[in-house]
Amino acid sequence: MDVSYMAVTFCTFVIDMRVLIVNTAERTGGAAIAANRLLHALNRNGVEARMLVRDRKTEASQVLNIPQSWRLKANFLWERGVIWMNNGLSKRNLFQVDIANAGTDITRMDEFKWADVIHLHWVNQGFLSLDNLDRILASGKPVVVTLHDQWYFTGICHYSGECEKYKSQCERCPMLKGRGSDLAKRVFDRKLAMYEGRNLTFVGCSRWMADLARQSRLTQGHTVTNIPNAIDTDVFKPMDKQEARTKHGLPADKKLLLFGAQRITDKRKGFDFLVEACEHISMHHPSLPEILGVVVLGGDAESVKEALPLPVYTVNYLSNEAEIAELYNAVDLFVTPSLQDNLPNTIVEAMACGTPCVGFNVGGIPEMISHKQDGYVADYCDSIDFAQGISWCLKDDRHETLSTAARAAALATYAKPAVAHRYLEVYQAALSHQ
């Protein structure tokens, strides 16, 4: 795929289109990072785009935040409180669900009135309520929704796991154990009513997410497609490994794995399976433990340091993309034993840096890693196969080939011009139905 040709073609037919990207945060979390990258991709490729957030972190002129007041914190606390009361006063799954019972009306804002297309991303935890979403849909403006998780097409959960109630009717949510009002049913029914007859397009970041969305009763009658998240391949690119290691204080003489997550202790991130895989390597691959180390990236990295049977090098959470790219280049392999994921930005970033990846066969991960071509896709929840994947990828005679293939795959699929072009087509289709 000639990405440069796509970018030129893209810019020649864009005429006066204004897009408002809406996300809870500007920089924190995978959805925020993806939304921010799309903002820059659109603006660099012929579309006038702005981003509206609740939690602003920079002074970027294209990023705007809603008026700040005590109500924002109150909205968040009120929503958590209602969930807590309907969950038998338990904190279990407190942040795995959202009921969108409080938020901010953005339809009155000048930024909303300015836009031709409203592009919603992750808007939970007290940013937009169901009432707010209803007003957005009722405005008559085309609405595009990027599915960073399942919330838009389930009742209240972000990931349904083995539950398939969202296909027909969410009720008696297995994530809540309280006997109060059926929150899942109430929210599902409300979404069903407000989606009906509206100019609404759903975009999954992965084919897996789009396929799940198509099975939901909530998306029937609406377009569902998939477009991957964009990445800046001029930032995330191959660099000198030893220079990167020196800068981050990492040993020059070891093969290094990288594991990272915003919350390493989040069970969905699968850290326990990485521990098991490393234990298997220590027992069954005697030559590796002497030369192998694990870099753990995340705010709570120190808390898991003792769990791994290999030397561990901790790095605090990095928000600067250039430093993150350096860290990917400093290691030999990125490992992501995630148990449930959509289209992890981390895999795309690592591949763009020429760093092969090992992950489980789950969610959108097998769409990203081509098994034994640019990385290794291990059997789901199989720590032994995960260990085999690590060993296989680290073989000196194949690592360079995997690295080159990973970079090529990232350029072909996730470069900003290619992703921006595909979103432009979605926007134009939505506008044609206005």
Predicted regions and their residues:
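A short, well-ordered alpha-helix in the C-terminal region of glycosyltransferases
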Residues: 398-413, 419-425
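Conserved donor-binding/catalytic core segment of Leloir-type glycosyltransferases
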Residues: 251-269, 275-279
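A short, active-site helix/loop in glycosyltransferases that binds the activated sugar's phosphate group
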Residues: 154-159, 178-224, 231-235, 241
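Short alpha-helical donor nucleotide-sugar binding micro-motif in glycosyltransferases
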Residues: 326-331
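Conserved acidic donor-binding segment of nucleotide-sugar-dependent glycosyltransferases
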Residues: 371-372, 376-383, 392-397
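Short hydrophobic beta-strand element within catalytic cores of glycosyltransferases
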Residues: 356-359
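Aromatic "clamp/platform" in nucleotide-sugar-dependent glycosyltransferases that forms part
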Residues: 339
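Nucleotide-activated donor-binding/catalytic signature segment of Leloir-type glycosyltransferases, i.e.
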Residues: 285-291, 296-325
